[in-house]
Amino acid sequence: MFNKLVLILNCGSSSLKFSVVSSDNYTTKLSGIVEFLNLSQIRFFWKIKKKEYVRVINKSKSYDYALNYILTKILKEESKIFNNIACVGHRVVHGGVNLNKSVLITQEIIKLITDACSFAPLHNPINLLGIKASHAVLPHLKEKNVAVFDTSFHSSIPKFAYLYAIPYKFYKKFGIRKYGAHGISCQYSVCRSSELLQIELTSLNIIICHLGGGASVSVVKNGVCVDTSMGLTPLEGLIMGTRSGDIDPSVIFFMNKQLNLSISTINNILINKSGLLGLSGVSSDFRNLESEYNSNIRIKLAIDMFCYRLSKYISGYMSVVKGKLHGIVFTGGIGENSSLVRSIVISKLAFLNFKLNSDINMLMKSGKEGFINIKNTFPILVIPANEELIIAKESFSEIN
């Protein structure tokens, strides 16, 4: 007999994660991922109990196709699971000015998420596709769809940290300020760090490095976020797969006036053609870059720049907690799996008494969790991201 289940749709800019989680003990009944969307190949991978399934389509398919395949093929073929879905939880990257906590999705909420698309142009439109698809395939659950926002976690950031030094009216009238992202992942890292470090949540001071196709670093003081690297949009901060991260704003004006590039073209360059892809000239996928770190000068430069900027943010955030840090967390696809990135970054922080256990660091990947620091030095943790657990808990909380 199945307990009530929540279907979780985590629609990202380059992948689509899905899972079905039980309401009683949050065990996963089904999970999967769709990768390489909008390229020449689409790969479906899913797991039910201990059985694994893979389907590869050597043709570019739309996001709509992927969503419909998940909902009408993979899920419907598992009738015991499909028939016990009680609600649908959606990761939504940006809540905009008005949405800073999880909510049941209504037409009004859809409008507010749509209004926030300008803050997250890569993500919110895709998140809305997930909502639309679940409404179409699961119409009986239309009033039991829940939006869980990445920006909610960062709503505790103080005003002096989230404002930009531009005329104040732009904040008051248009909501131009720092909002952050990766908040759901950070929320899980905070909860899990508290358990692993055996420190009360309300006393916990940590720095969380969520490193994937998108990358950010956040500092948590007394259990709540007090600053983060991403800003008004997920473009600010660290170097990312295809995003530039921090640049001098005048670069935009220079490219517009001197190179005669339109604002929309520049926007596309900074979001889709920069970062690791732009620097390396090879790929935005870290898995394709890491193996050539020592043999390709441009790839080495890209990775070194990525690590340099991250180490600067970490050392700067140490001052926010006045040096009273309980640990650094690496999470996200790169954070969890790249021993190279962790090694380079931590080597730059040795003066702060951060030291890696090289042997353990090399082995820490593929879903493993734990400490990778040398004994009696600052704790360094690898915590696999589990946004789905947070979304499940928030979704059940909202419908109940």
Swiss-Prot record:
The Gene Ontology biological process annotation of the record reads: acetate metabolic process; acetyl-CoA biosynthetic process
Under which pathway is this protein filed?
Metabolic intermediate biosynthesis; acetyl-CoA biosynthesis; acetyl-CoA from acetate: step 1/2
Gene Ontology CC:
cytosol
Decide whether keyword Ribonucleoprotein is in the record. Answer: no
Residues that bind Mg(2+), according to the entry?
A: 10, 387
List of residues binding substrate: 91
User: What's one GO MF term for it?
Assistant: acetate kinase activity
Which residues participate directly in catalysis? 150 (proton donor/acceptor)
EC number(s) recorded for this UniProt protein: 2.7.2.1
User: Which Pfam families does this entry report, sorted A to Z?
Assistant: Acetate_kinase
Cofactor binding, note field: Mg(2+). Can also accept Mn(2+).
**Which cofactor names does the annotation list?**
Mg(2+); Mn(2+)
Q: Has the keyword Magnesium been applied to this entry? A: yes
Q: Which UniProt keywords apply?
A: ATP-binding, Cytoplasm, Kinase, Magnesium, Metal-binding, Nucleotide-binding, Transferase
Q: Which residues are annotated as site, described as Transition state stabilizer? A: 182, 243
Which proteins does it associate with, and in what oligomeric form?
Homodimer.
Protein family per UniProt = Belongs to the acetokinase family.
Write down what this protein is called. Acetate kinase
Q: Which species expresses this protein natively?
A: Buchnera aphidicola subsp. Baizongia pistaciae (strain Bp)
The gene it comes from is ackA
